[in-house]
Amino acid sequence: MTRSIAGELQQLREQGLYRSLRTVAGSQGSRVVAEGREVVLLCSNNYLGLADHPSLKRAAVEAVERYGTGSGASRLVSGTMELHAALEERLARFKGTEAALVFNSGYAANSGIIPALVGRGDVVFSDRLNHASIVDGCLLSRARFVRYPHNDMNALERLLAEHRGAGRMLIVTDGVFSMDGDLAPLPALVALKRQYGALLMVDDAHGTGVLGESGRGSAEQFEVAADIDLQMGTLGKALGGFGAYVAASAEVVELLINRARSFIFSTSLPPAVLAAARAALDLVDSPEGKALRRRLARSAALFRDALQEAGFDTMGSETQIVPALVGEAEPAMTFTRRLLEEGFYVQGIRPPTVPAGTCRLRCTLMATHDESDLERAVAAMARIGKELGIV
């Protein structure tokens, strides 16, 4: 019998796992209008506030006036514009690599890069808390897919030793884990990839523009950028735009151009997006960018400390992603609704995004948040958390 779609939707509702879209009005600043009222936005990845920055908007408008609204084709047909080449050259300089390649999204990047690098007879090692796009890329590759416990380097070493000689070996990790806000131990991963002759790929979607002295990401923070084979990141979080990139050797980029299906078979990014990304990189390199990173780091530390003092488990967060552990799905979503009523938009996170029993409020900080708004948010969370028996 054909499985009922209506029945499947009802089951999601009964399990507290049903999802729906909420429309917000205005730009992605620290405040938006949701359900007819202005609220403080605490779940955006617009970490530096660049999505509404005048420099990015001006660059996008000028690009549209000169180049039009679309690229017209995939990159290997006629869709490689001078803006693509200019952005990729800028990204390579930004990351200190020989070359870079842009993709249409972080999901498209990971689901295209990994199958281009490994296949049948090869092995890919993935942290158990890696992003879904990495998981799907590993599955699509048809390589042997080995998941190691989160940040457990002893377990990873045992698995590498077990599979030594099994073909090409690829280690893939998030740089900043998107649901916990903690960091991958990159120096230890570099040591293991050297010892076992593996490739190392780091998805730095949530570190690009934020971490490191000059905003180059988690690899810069740990001073291991030169030892990472592929540095992937996005243009749509701290950089305020849309799309993704990978920075690597010229040889690796050449292989991806020829093998990454999500790159080959997609119409390329449009002019406005490309120009805005270049403007964002310039801003990250400026004194203003440095000031924004410092303000973000300060706000994140104050917010995290205040939540911990209020009794919340912030799950080892070290970055601008600050989760507050709730536990089960129903109280997490009740918490979300109550906070919205109080004027704070925080999204509850449920399975399959996170493991069962670890539902949470995923709070994300922006450099443009007012400290007073963050203080009020913590007070509201503490009050509601006590009412729900969470703290």
From Swiss-Prot:
* Pathway(s) per entry: Cofactor biosynthesis; biotin biosynthesis
Q: Which reactions does this protein catalyse?
A: 6-carboxyhexanoyl-[ACP] + L-alanine + H(+) = (8S)-8-amino-7-oxononanoate + holo-[ACP] + CO2
Superkingdom per UniProt: Bacteria
Q: Which CDD domains match?
A: KBL_like
Keyword Nucleus tagged? no
The chain residues annotated with the modification N6-(pyridoxal phosphate)lysine are K237
Q: Does the keyword Transferase apply?
A: yes
Cofactor requirement:
pyridoxal 5'-phosphate
Q: Which GO terms describe its molecular function?
A: 8-amino-7-oxononanoate synthase activity; pyridoxal phosphate binding
Enzyme Commission identifier(s): 2.3.1.47
Task: Please name the InterPro entries in this protein's record.
Answer: Aminotrans_II_pyridoxalP_BS, Aminotransferase_I/II_large, AON_synthase_class-II, AONS_Archaea/Proteobacteria, AONS_Proteobacteria, PyrdxlP-dep_Trfase, PyrdxlP-dep_Trfase_major, PyrdxlP-dep_Trfase_small
Q: Which residues are pyridoxal 5'-phosphate-binding?
A: G106, Y107, S178, H206, T234
What are the alphabetically sorted keywords of the record? Biotin biosynthesis, Pyridoxal phosphate, Transferase
A single Gene Ontology biological process assigned to it is: biotin biosynthetic process
Which Gene3D superfamilies does the UniProt entry name for this protein? Aspartate Aminotransferase, domain 1 (3.90.1150.10), Type I PLP-dependent aspartate aminotransferase-like (Major domain) (3.40.640.10)
Q: Which positions make up the signal peptide?
A: none
Amino-acid positions noted as binding substrate in the UniProt annotation, renumbered to this chain: R19, H131, T353
Give the quaternary structure.
Homodimer.
Query: What is this protein's function per UniProt?
Result: Catalyzes the decarboxylative condensation of pimeloyl-[acyl-carrier protein] and L-alanine to produce 8-amino-7-oxononanoate (AON), [acyl-carrier protein], and carbon dioxide.
Q: What is stated as this protein's family in its record?
A: Belongs to the class-II pyridoxal-phosphate-dependent aminotransferase family. BioF subfamily.
Q: What name does UniProt use for this protein?
A: 8-amino-7-oxononanoate synthase
**Source organism of this protein record:** Geobacter sulfurreducens (strain ATCC 51573 / DSM 12127 / PCA)
Query: What's the gene?
Result: bioF
